[in-house]
């Protein structure tokens, strides 16, 4: 896989910088065996995108990366933002192909009020990110999603519902949806 070879070369090139980012922790978690990955796919009735599968089996199952770093495969199926930490349903299709947000958010008077908890709970429900792994925490409750089921299979999306900004695809300079490999390669290329 070309993006994985490129990422490996950049890891070697930027090793000192990655060490500083990791702050003496492991740069990458241990890789997963293909057998464990296949078991995960079988248990969740999905197939992981090939570039992501190569990354977690050849480079690391989580570690340094965009935002606050990559989550492990196991941690990526839990929505850490919600109090009850629910599992994300992977065998249902991701429902979006274009940016999404609730219409009421644009017209809400944020200076004088706060939405009722029932409305917020519906907005934050994991059904909005079905078919996705939460692969990285961006900060301030935002998360990067990797679509593993649905039309957007293999593409990375940004979930900014924590600040009421909705869910949107991560785009490259040509305004095109990007894959996991492209997303990670772009991050590591642009490290200073």
Predicted regions mapped to residue ranges:
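Low-complexity, Gly/Ser/Thr/Pro-rich intrinsically disordered linker/tail segments
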Residues: 182-192
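A surface-exposed partner-binding patch
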Residues: 1-127, 131-134
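General helical structural elements
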Residues: 87-89, 165, 180
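Segments surrounding the PLD/"HKD" phosphodiesterase catalytic module and close analogs
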Residues: 143-177
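Short amphipathic alpha-helical interaction segments
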Residues: 127, 138, 172-176
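N-terminal low-complexity/disordered regulatory or targeting extensions
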Residues: 4-7, 165, 186
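Short, well-ordered loop/turn elements at secondary-structure boundaries
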Residues: 128-131, 138-142, 151-152
């Amino acid at each position: 896989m070309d993006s994985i070879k490129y990422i490996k070369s950049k890891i070697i090139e930027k090793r000192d910088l990655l060490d500083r980012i990791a702050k003496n922790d492991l740069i990458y978690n241990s890789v997963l065996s293909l057998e464990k990955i296949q078991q995960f796919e079988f248990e969740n009735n999905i197939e992981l995108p090939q570039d992501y599968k190569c990354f977690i089996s050849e480079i690391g199952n989580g570690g340094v990366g965009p935002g606050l770093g990559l989550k492990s495969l196991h941690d990526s199926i839990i929505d850490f933002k919600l109090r009850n930490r629910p599992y994300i349903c992977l065998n249902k299709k991701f429902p979006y192909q274009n940016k999404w947000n609730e219409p009421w958010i644009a017209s809400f008077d944020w200076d004088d009020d706060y939405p009722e908890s029932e409305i917020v709970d519906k907005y934050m429900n994991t059904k909005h990110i079905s078919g996705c792994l939460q692969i990285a925490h961006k900060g301030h409750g935002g998360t990067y999603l990797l679509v593993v089921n649905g039309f957007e299979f293999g593409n990375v999306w940004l979930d900014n519902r924590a600040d009421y900004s909705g869910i949107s695809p991560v785009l490259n300079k040509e305004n095109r949806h990007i894959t996991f490999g492209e997303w990670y390669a772009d991050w590591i290329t642009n490290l200073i």
